[in-house]
């Protein structure tokens, strides 16, 4: 029988993506994928990720928690939010985002098999 208790180490992720100023490692736990991303100072979605995905803004949704640093997000509709370390967040598709200040931003995001929730994927629904 399959065990109901399971752990995984970030030392052995299922996937690693390293676009400009970014290191993102993903671990699958059943139907849920956890992605731990480290964005360096100077990281901005529209400069570091946009060239790889070809959309005007990030078209992925995100649910996660910022573990370290600070990120500013501007939605396509003009609304803005700053995410601080320790805060959980949900971002709808259609936004740009960047690291604020000189500290790397480290976040942990959650997704399911039914939808992509990552800045480094196309995020198509």
Where are these regions (language model features)?
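A short, N-terminal "cap"/entry segment at the start of jelly-roll beta-barrel domains
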Residues: 1-40, 46-47, 122-125
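Short, acidic/polar N-cap/turn motifs at the starts of alpha helices
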Residues: 22-24, 34, 61, 70, ...
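Short beta-strand segments
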Residues: 35, 79-81, 106
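Conserved GNAT-family N-acetyltransferase fold
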Residues: 37-39, 64, 89
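Short beta-strand segments in beta-sandwich/barrel cores
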Residues: 44-45, 69-74, 97
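Glycine- and acidic-residue-biased ligand/ion/polar-headgroup-sensing regions
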Residues: 51-77
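Short acidic-glycine-tyrosine-enriched beta hairpin
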Residues: 75-94
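Ligand-binding loop in jelly-roll beta-barrel domains
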Residues: 92-117
